[in-house]
A protein has these predicted regions:
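Predominantly the C-terminal beta-signal and adjacent terminal strand-loop region
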Residues: 149-198
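Gram-negative (and chloroplast) outer-membrane scaffold detector with strong preference
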Residues: 60-125, 129-138, 146-148, 188-198
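A mature extracytoplasmic/lumenal domain signature
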Residues: 6, 78-80, 158
Length: 198
């Protein structure tokens, strides 16, 4: 039993040492179009309305992670968008599977999940309304990686994300109750950047 346990530990240690881990950091530009919708209800006067729209913005995206055995890439990324008085911060955990085309060129496909935070001050006929909401964001991405040098890599990709982010604000104005709901739906993104592999 002791020899079996020792052999198992030795095999585990050998496997861990054999794992090729290559840390990296990256920076790039991401262009995102975010779709959202909302509704307004004033029950006291029988009024209700709904709307949908989209905002587009370009943001600096930062990421850090590691490539495991030249095949699996894990990373954390952060981006902040600002448009029409709204701030959107997105923090993601990303996984990519790499498909080598040749020694310098890889394609990848993967998934991401994390948190999105949305803040906006809206001026309305009843005064300023503060929208502050956060929740889950998740989705899929595809892209390509090209080695410029041994350590410097060019990356370009596309991503699609869904959001579980909404907020409902209720109040009373001139004795009349109202309710305002805002909800993030989905987004599409295009990214290009540079990674440094250690």
């Amino acid at each position: 039993k002791k020899s079996l346990a020792m052999a198992s530990l030795l095999a585990l240690g050998t496997s861990a040492m054999a794992l090729d881990v290559q840390p990296f950091v990256g920076v790039g530009i991401e262009r995102t179009t975010l779709d959202y919708k909302g509704s307004v209800s004033v029950p006291g006067i029988g009024y209700s309305d709904s709307y949908s729209d989209d905002d587009s913005d370009t943001a600096l995206k930062l990421k850090a992670g590691a490539i495991l055995d030249k095949t699996h890439r894990l990373s954390v990324s952060h981006a902040k968008y600002s448009d029409n008085g709204a701030d959107v911060r997105i923090l993601l955990l990303n996984y990519d599977y790499l498909f080598p085309i040749n020694e310098k060129f890889n394609l990848y496909a993967g998934a991401h999940a994390g948190q999105a935070k949305y803040e906006q001050d809206v001026n309305t006929a009843i005064g300023k309304i503060d929208i502050d909401m956060s929740g889950l964001v998740y989705g899929l991405q595809v892209g390509a990686l090209f080695d410029i040098t041994k350590n410097i890599e060019l990356e370009a990709g596309l991503a699609y994300s869904k959001y579980n982010v909404d907020d409902t604000i209720s109040g009373t104005y001139l004795g009349v109750d109202y309710s305002l709901k805002t909800e993030l739906e989905d987004s599409t993104s295009m990214f290009i950047g540079i990674n440094y592999k250690f």
